[in-house]
Amino acid sequence: MIFYSLVFNPYEVNTYIVAANDGQCAIIDPACCSPDEQAVLKNFIADKGLRPEWLVNTHGHFDHVIGNFFVCQTWRDIKTAAHRDDLFLMENVYRQGEIFGFSVEQPPTPAVFLKDGDTVTFGNDGFLKIYHIPGHSPGSIVLHSAEQNRVIVGDVMFRTSVGRTDLPGGDYDLLIDGIEKKLMTLPPDTAVLPGHGPETSINRERKFNPFLKNKKTT
């Protein structure tokens, strides 16, 4: 598999495209919010010769799903997926956008509701395991590739930080507990691909993230 990333919208959301060797791919958090950004995504996929099979949202906040409508209109056969616990957010995406001054097309309801332990498979070698880590939102998920030693974490964790928990459905204790039990138990050299900002690693966050309970001091 190959992991690509593009940065979209004023919130600088990382949109990830994970491609199997045969070109089938999954689009994670399409965040393109303007015609120019939509063209960037469409042209990137065309230039790489990719064929989108999945659209997966790590969570239902509008900045991460603002491109869902465009993706579903462009690739009509794409399968859409998210965690059911964020459905209430996704059903009100246009209202979320209005609060922040954005016009957001209401995306289709996810066709597949993912849960902890599920897998997303595509092409001849695309395989991502799902972990449910609520706290930033009730239905936040991360997608892990053991083979590639990478995990896409949405807004669950960032470099030396974690996702905010003051939005509807947020829960700080749940977030930290999930990070400790499901992310910090991954191999230390696992690359962490967040929803905003630069890449990090499990080892780096264990050493330097001030929000983790069992932070290493050596």
Where is each model-derived feature located?
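Hydrophobic residues at beta-strand termini and immediately following loops
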Residues: 6, 114, 133
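Short catalytic-loop micro-motif centered on adjacent basic/acidic residues
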Residues: 26-29, 54-57, 130-132
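Conserved beta-strand hairpin/beta-sheet module of binuclear metal-dependent hydrolase folds
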Residues: 1-48, 142-153
